[in-house]
Amino acid sequence: VTEAADIIQWIRPSRLFNEGRLHIGAVLGVLNGRVQIFTEDIQVKEAHQVMDFDGIISPGFVDLQVNGGGGVLLNETPTKEAIWDIAKAHRKYGTTGILPTVITDSVSVLSRAVDAAMEAVGQNGILGLHIEGPHISVERRGTHKAEFVRPLDEDTIR
């Protein structure tokens, strides 16, 4: 448990969104870049410097379907580095966790995307991989290329 005396930075936003509520007058205690204390009733002593912030602080966003970002599409560049570039592009808008998404494509592209995601997961906000297709309806495939739509088979499951 972190004590108030251990906190090295105090932040008082004008509004803070947390746990489904908008808080006014909340104070955050930050240590080593991580929020340690969140309270609405702490009296921060004059010995502590408080940074007043005129804006909203909220938890980072989690995006469960991210095909690309920063000029990179996962289907075109199924590598760990591309996944990190995609995450970096989304992070500047408040997204702290993503599921990079690969859509219906060749077995080779899907396999490389899976391998890249397995290397990247747990780093830079990569939570896993969203595989969209290829086992979908040809008639309702939308933007997915028909030549890559296929039924599920035992080889794919292995």
Predicted regions and their residues:
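Histidine-rich, glycine-flanked metal-binding segment
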Residues: 2-10, 15-58
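Short beta-strand-to-turn element immediately C-terminal to the catalytic PLP-Schiff-base lysine
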Residues: 17, 30, 74-76, 150
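Histidine/acidic residue-rich metal-binding segments in metalloenzymes
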Residues: 42, 150-158
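Short amphipathic alpha-helices and their capping/turn segments at secondary-structure boundaries
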Residues: 46-55, 113-124
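Divalent metal-dependent hydrolysis catalytic cores, especially in the metallo-beta-lactamase
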Residues: 67-69, 84-113, 125-139
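Glycine-rich phosphate-binding "P-loop"
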Residues: 71, 139-151
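Distinct, well-ordered alpha-helical segments
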Residues: 111-114, 144, 154-157
